Each structure stands twice: as C-alpha cells, then as structure tokens.
Amino acid sequence: MKKFLLILVLLFAISNAKERLVVLDPASIETLFMLGAGEQIVGIANLQHSNIYPSDKISQLTSVGTFSNPSLEKIISLKPSLVILSSYSLNLEEGLKNFGIKSLYLKADRFDDIKKNIQILAQITHKNEEGKRLISEFEKGLESLKNDPLNRSAIYLYSNNPLMAFNDNSLMAEILTLIGIKNLSPKSQIERPIISAEFILKQNPDLLILGINANQAFLTQNALLNQTKAIKTGQIYTNEKTRILLRLSPKIIERIAEFKQALKSLKDS
C-alpha cells in the first residue's frame, strides 16, 4: 500500500513538474504569461525596438542576449529543460543538442498558428485548461474585431526606398481584411514586393499606411503619389508599432483593436 501511494505521489509530481524554459521568441513569452506560466521562464532574449508583454515582469527575467544574437553559453548556464527558439536563433539547435538540451521552434504566419501554439505551450507547461480558455478568448476577440468594419481601401508600405508593400497574402493583409480594409497591394510570392508609384496611383487607395521604414515626407514630395486620393485627403497613417502588430501572440487582439481605432480616428478627423 505504501509503495502504491509513493508511486501516486511521484506520478503527481511529474505531471505537475515545472519546466525551466529559456524563451527566445517574443510571441511565445507573451503567450506563456497569458497562460499563467510565466514563472516557468528562467531566461529570455531581449528586443531592441519594442517591448514584450508584461514589461514589468519581463524586466526581472535573466537575459541571454538579444533577439538576433542570443548567447549559447548564457543559455546553457541556466540549465533549461527546454529552449523555445525564434526564426533568428535556429542556428543554436545543434549546439543545444550537443549539451543534451531540447529545443522547439513554433512557426507562426497566420492567426490559426496562434491557436496551435497556445495549445502546444499549454501542454508543455501543464496549463491545458488555461489554454482552452485563452483560445476561446482569442477566437471571440477575432470575431469582435470584424464588427464595425472600416470599409476602406489601403496600401500598407513597409518602406519607401525602395517602395515595398506587404503583399496580398501576408499576415498584414489578413489583419487589414479582418478590420474591413481592402488591401490593394499586389498578389506575390514575395512577402514584401517592390512596387512603383505608378502602381499606387493606379490602385488609388483611400488610405496609405506607413510601416517600419517608410516616412511621410518622401511620399508627399513624390509628384505621382501626390495625385492619389489618400494624399489629397490627408489619409496617411504612420504606424510606429508595425513590428509589434505583427507579433503572433494572443495580445495581437488588443494591438489590432488599437490599430483599428487609430485608423478610424484618422478617417473621422
């Protein structure tokens, strides 16, 4: 009987064991905190251009370097049970394997990938019920964002030198469609195709949205672009939060809502 009870205790301990996670992917960090599993993170990679939610708790975590250049030595020193990689740190996989450290890369390109990754992280951290709740909240958030569509057309420029837009089958296009904006960027296998001022004029969008490497001064100085409806009516919006808007964690719901409200305010101004 005592042996049986001991086995039960051991099984319970294993099933509720806390992971020691080093997380190099910002979206996974946010998802883990939203699952209530933040205490299982022992190290992260820092970002230089944007914050990671929740910033007050993130600042207390051990850094293993930057997002683009994490340190293998620092990661190993934390004795993680699992390292969650980003697309920028896939080159660490072999080195981690040599030290007997497991790693995982959670690819994410679309909204559906967020739900899949919530489920995976919930299983890893023994937060399955929290995962189901978070997926449900995420789905409801997506549906809510479809309400009161903006009913406009737009081209979202990634940069203006050269002129590069987010293509019509990108995550950004999915975001625009969700809030009722017709994306007039071209269909392309290239995620951010180069386009011409002539193309923009021909499409003549209601709105021009400027992203990470685009600035309004260049557009207003371009004779062709000055003929577009967007510039004539002053419907140009610079989104300084483009990077964080494209981060595929459940926090994207709040970020899209903020983005949508900013575009609505521009229209009403």
Each predicted region: which residue ranges?
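Flexible loop/hinge segments that line or gate small-molecule binding clefts
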Residues: Y88-E93, K97-I120
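Structured C-terminal subdomain patch of bacterial secreted/periplasmic proteins
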Residues: R20, L24, K115-Q123, K132, ...
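Sec-dependent N-terminal signal peptides
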Residues: F4-S15
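His/Asp/Glu-enriched short active-site or ligand-binding loop at hydrolase and phosphoryl-transfer sites
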Residues: A45, L171-R192, T238
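A short, structured surface patch at a secondary-structure boundary
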Residues: R20-L78, L82-Y88, I181-L184
